[in-house]
Amino acid sequence: MSNRLISGSTVALVTPFKEDGSVDYEALRRLVRFHREAGTDIILPCGTTGESPTLTNEEEAEIIRTVRDEAGDSMMVAAGAGTNDTRHAVELSRNAEKAGAQAILSVAPYYNKPSQEGYYQHFRHVAESVSVPIIIYNVPGRTASNVSAETILRLAHDFDNVLAVKEASANFEQIMTLIDERPERFSVMTGEDGLMLPFMALGGDGVISVAANQVPKVVKGLIDAMKAGNLEEARAINRKYRKLFRLNFIDSNPVPVKYALSLMGMVEEAYRLPLVPMSDADKATMKAELEQLGLI
């Protein structure tokens, strides 16, 4: 049995806003309690799903403090703290640690399209700036370039606090290389709900999930079933919720999941530009699936 620190079901938490665009801290606390009661293993605010590009440094710090306060010792609090400017990424990481984050999710620099050595040096500076664990976030669909398995493994071997990767490349050759060649302490997490089952079958450690915002017990149940070797149970869960996993990306994340949560009475349907509400047709599709699953 592995003792890896980063594993299980992690929710990539939405950031609830009020109609005036301010952060709804009361709703944020409700969300944390929802996940505490559901048994979520790790809660992760201020990531992509949390609309981090539109949060100020001060808002991010206050969100992390609020989540940590409400979570207590019931689950680990990781936090998104990355950007494409290394100096700013270091600043955000230090701020997150100071605010109470117990791990940092650091996205690969986007837009700049650095070389593999550039990626290495970026994450080296981040890792050396904090004492908490670092989760490298590799998401080529948003960053327009891939952090190679070789670079990720080099970082994992060179820095004791580089403890995980959120791998959202859907490149199974890369995923298998990471799983097969990693240090024992290093976790490989998927960032794609729709790939949880095959990912775990290959030896992955868990998921950093969008769908866990809506169905945390379901996501944890699937991951736990795969860890226990209960393939048929996991397949049944995946079959039932596969459409929801897909509909969460019918529009740009987190627009669909936030709309779903608004129907579930958890948050207001409020975003910060440039994100806008879904089309009426997509809303109807999502609502119908939530009704089908008995979530509303």
From Swiss-Prot:
It is found in: Cytoplasm. One of its GO terms (biological process) is lysine biosynthetic process via diaminopimelate. The active site is at 137 (proton donor/acceptor), 166 (schiff-base intermediate with substrate). Pyruvate binds at residues 49, 208. InterPro entries: Aldolase_TIM, DapA, DapA-like, Schiff_base-form_aldolases_AS. Transmembrane segments: none annotated. Coiled coil: none annotated. One of its GO terms (cellular component) is cytosol. Pathway: Amino-acid biosynthesis; L-lysine biosynthesis via DAP pathway; (S)-tetrahydrodipicolinate from L-aspartate: step 3/4. Pfam families: DHDPS. Keywords: Amino-acid biosynthesis, Cytoplasm, Diaminopimelate biosynthesis, Lyase, Lysine biosynthesis, Schiff base. The keyword GTP-binding does not apply. The record marks 48, 111 as: Part of a proton relay during catalysis. Homotetramer; dimer of dimers. Catalyzes the condensation of (S)-aspartate-beta-semialdehyde [(S)-ASA] and pyruvate to 4-hydroxy-tetrahydrodipicolinate (HTPA). This is 4-hydroxy-tetrahydrodipicolinate synthase. It comes from Chlorobaculum parvum (strain DSM 263 / NCIMB 8327).
